[in-house]
């Protein structure tokens, strides 16, 4: 992001009492910190030809020289860094720099390949060689330059997502492990973190790292930034270490803030204003004494998919206002409805100051099932206040004469396509409508048996009934409605009695950059007794594994059959560790 944008951001941070700016200066997408001792970092690893992140990451991950015509990228000058620090200091904000190690170092090897295990740049190399002393000399030199510029007592060293895929075959790393008595790769990484910590302590600074630095043994005086949930932070606090909470589930602002249709590209997740506001940075699992180690919470905006400063502002505001209230107000005194009224007052003021703020345009759809009446009740609400919501149930776009939502649930026993839109009197707001398909189909509420494997524990959705609860997923797998699997899916639905069947279908998604792929094929089988099954069709996915943009595919099986048991099988398309996601098995 341009330094001018950072200066504007600092002004808004001060206005809303946010007092730490964590500056992620280097990563696999480019080196942005100016080094006098290692000038090739900015000459050879700060520019690339592909602006689009997916194209760059999937294509070749190669960089070009600084003066290459048409190249995308750049780096900060020392004067720009000094200006940012000076401005932040005047506003009472501390700037914390981050230099990534040992992972996220793809760009580093394009300038200094000798720091890799193989001694050359390769497509899959992202971790520095811990066995070479030259690696430590390099980072000590870089940290010296960082310390000269940044007065922060904390220096962030990353420590996250090391692939560890070359250390096992690297003679230097294996020699290091033998000499130091290290039993695995996690201890090898911990050796590096602890050694870097000793160096920082000798310079009067403290080490800060992502929660992976817990693995293999935590450095004695390290502070942990917990991003993979709260577990790492809880573990560190119980061990007497200071912690900053920043879980991806609640405070990753590179995620979509509403359903993705009509929104600029984001990083696949789903973090609404309400979700940010709901976060409690003090886990109930900790004692009052352990709570003292929770220094605060941090929101993160990763910019792989953020194209410019205006886009960055759109992702940050007004969700940063929710974070401010989270960290400054006791949870017992917080009220989302009260906050929503106030944040609607602040949005136009942010706009007056030139901030490209997200205009609070989400219509939330909450669906409840009545199994006795076999009906679906739909409740609508909006972030925007005051506002009018008009809707249709036949899939047509709402107009000024369409039904006005007055808070009473919309009830239906049929299959409907709800379309809702915000209005100002007779005028529709220049915001996209929301579409939501719902129906009370024959499998809703029926018994489901998972054969062999169940869902991945991180993505349970509604558990055993998730695939027959009538809840369709939104365009993000993190909305709590998509059930995720790292094993083949094999489920059986018991309809309770032999039933006439006309149609069975299930929808899957692909989000390649999040390791979510289509199943290789989907098969539907039927049975009267639950023992002997007959196949009524198998479909192979039409989606290429190479498609990296989000894709949704419905596997549809029309039929004229009678059966009590329906079995749906979906085969994984990729190797272990990759996901398939589905939201509902619909039966008519």
Task: List PLM regions with ranges.
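Substrate-binding cleft of carbohydrate-active enzyme catalytic domains
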Residues: 1-205
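Aromatic, loop-rich ligand-recognition surfaces of beta-strand-rich domains
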Residues: 473-537, 549-588
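Hydrophobic residues within beta-strands of alpha/beta enzymes
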Residues: 21-23, 155, 297, 504, ...
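Flexible, acidic glycine-rich loops studded with aromatic residues
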Residues: 207-212, 217-222, 228-377
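Flexible loop/turn segments at secondary-structure boundaries
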Residues: 1-2, 28-34, 102-108, 156, ...
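Short, compositionally stereotyped local motifs that mark structural "simplifiers"
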Residues: 330, 334, 340-490, 509
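Surface-exposed loop/edge segments in extracytoplasmic proteins
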Residues: 397-403, 531-538
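Mature N-terminal, pre-catalytic/accessory segment of carbohydrate-active enzymes
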Residues: 1-19, 419-420, 433-442, 452, ...
């Amino acid at each position: 992001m341009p330094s001018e944008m950072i200066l504007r951001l600092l002004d808004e941070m001060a206005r809303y009492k946010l007092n730490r700016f964590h500056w992620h200066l280097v990563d696999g997408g480019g080196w942005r910190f100016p080094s006098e001792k290692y000038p090739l970092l900015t000459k050879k690893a700060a520019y690339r030809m592909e602006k689009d992140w997916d194209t760059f990451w999937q294509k070749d991950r190669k960089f070009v020289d600084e003066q290459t015509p048409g190249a995308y990228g750049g780096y900060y000058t020392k004067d720009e860094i000094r200006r940012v620090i000076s401005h932040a200091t005047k506003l009472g904000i501390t700037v914390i720099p981050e230099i990534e190690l040992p992972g996220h170092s793809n760009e580093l090897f394009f300038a200094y390949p000798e720091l890799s295990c193989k001694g050359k740049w390769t497509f899959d190399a992202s971790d520095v060689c811990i066995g070479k002393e030259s690696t430590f000399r390099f980072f000590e030199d870089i940290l010296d330059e960082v310390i000269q510029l940044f007065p922060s007592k904390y220096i962030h060293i990353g420590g996250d997502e090391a692939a560890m895929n070359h250390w096992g075959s690297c003679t230097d790393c294996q020699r290091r492990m033998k000499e130091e008595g290290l039993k695995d790769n996690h201890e090898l990484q911990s050796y590096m973190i602890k050694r870097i910590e000793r160096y920082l302590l000798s310079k009067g600074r403290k080490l800060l790292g992502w929660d992976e630095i817990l693995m293999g043994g935590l450095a004695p005086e390290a502070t942990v930034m917990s991003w993979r949930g709260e577990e790492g932070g809880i573990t560190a606090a119980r061990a007497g270490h200071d912690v900053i909470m920043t879980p991806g589930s609640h405070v990753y602002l590179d995620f979509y803030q509403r359903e993705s249709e009509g929104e600029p590209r984001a990083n696949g997740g789903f973090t609404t204003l309400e979700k940010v506001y709901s976060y409690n940075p003090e886990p109930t699992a900790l004692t009052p004494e352990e709570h003292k180690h929770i220094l605060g919470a941090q929101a993160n905006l990763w910019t792989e998919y953020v194209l410019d400063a205006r886009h960055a502002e759109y992702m940050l505001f007004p969700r940063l206002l929710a974070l401010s209230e989270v960290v400054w107000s006791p949870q017992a005194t917080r009220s989302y409805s009260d906050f929503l009224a106030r944040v609607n007052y602040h949005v136009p003021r942010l706009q007056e100051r030139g901030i490209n703020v997200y205009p609070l345009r989400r219509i939330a759809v909450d669906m409840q099932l009545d199994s006795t009446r076999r009906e679906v009740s739909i409740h609508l609400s909006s972030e925007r206040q005051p506002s009018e919501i008009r809707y249709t149930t036949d899939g047509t776009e709402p107009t000024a004469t369409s039904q006005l939502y007055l808070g009473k649930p919309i009830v239906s026993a049929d299959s409907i396509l709800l379309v809702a839109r915000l209005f100002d009197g007779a005028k529709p707001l220049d915001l996209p409508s929301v579409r939501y398909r719902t129906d009370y189909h024959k499998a809703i509420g029926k018994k489901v048996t998972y054969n062999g494997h169940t869902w991945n524990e991180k993505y349970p959705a509604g558990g055993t009934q998730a695939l027959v609860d009538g809840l369709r997923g939104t365009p993000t797998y993190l909305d709590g409605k998509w059930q995720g699997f790292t094993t083949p899916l094999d489920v059986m639905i018991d309809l309770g009695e032999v039933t006439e069947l006309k149609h069975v279908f299930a929808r899957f998604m692909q989000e390649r950059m999040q390791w979510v792929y289509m199943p290789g094929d989907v098969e539907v089988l039927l049975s009267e007794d639950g023992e002997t099954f007959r196949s009524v069709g198998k479909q192979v996915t039409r989606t290429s594994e190479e498609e990296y943009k989000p894709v949704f595919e419905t596997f549809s099986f029309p039929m004229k059959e009678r059966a009590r048991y329906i079995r749906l099988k979906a085969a994984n398309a990729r190797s272990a560790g990759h996901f398939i996601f589905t939201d509902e098995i619909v039966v008519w």
